[in-house]
Amino acid sequence: MSQKTVHDQDNALLLETGNTKVAPPPRYQVLLLNDDYTPMDFVIVVLQQFFAMDLKKATQVMLHVHTRGRGVCGFYTREVAESKVAQVNEFSRIHQHPLLCTMKQA
């Protein structure tokens, strides 16, 4: 909601409110990319730890990534998506796996 400052005849401060619509921020897909070296169990751990998936959902997404080459982990604002991508890539690097996480605008 926006406010407009107006002064009346007695120089008193009045505020006028208007209905200004703000567009929602753009959403980004966070994606995992398949590789031939990262164990499936590690991918499931990543999905559970960083994307709050239960075991069943994490297994479904992991199998999708494995069979189709990539899979969507979630939709987020740009800053959150960037943070998740960085966290997953760092976690993979620390554990010496080549798993890659990326993002694209939805």
Curated annotation (Swiss-Prot):
Superkingdom, taxonomy of origin: Bacteria
Protein purpose: Involved in the modulation of the specificity of the ClpAP-mediated ATP-dependent protein degradation.
Protein name: ATP-dependent Clp protease adapter protein ClpS
SUPFAM superfamilies in the record: ClpS-like
Record-stated family: Belongs to the ClpS family.
Assembly behavior: Binds to the N-terminal domain of the chaperone ClpA.
Any single biological process term in GO: proteolysis
Biased composition (Basic and acidic residues): 1-10
Region (Disordered): 1-23
Coiled coil: none
InterPro entries in UniProt: ClpS, ClpS_core, Ribosomal_bL12_C/ClpS-like
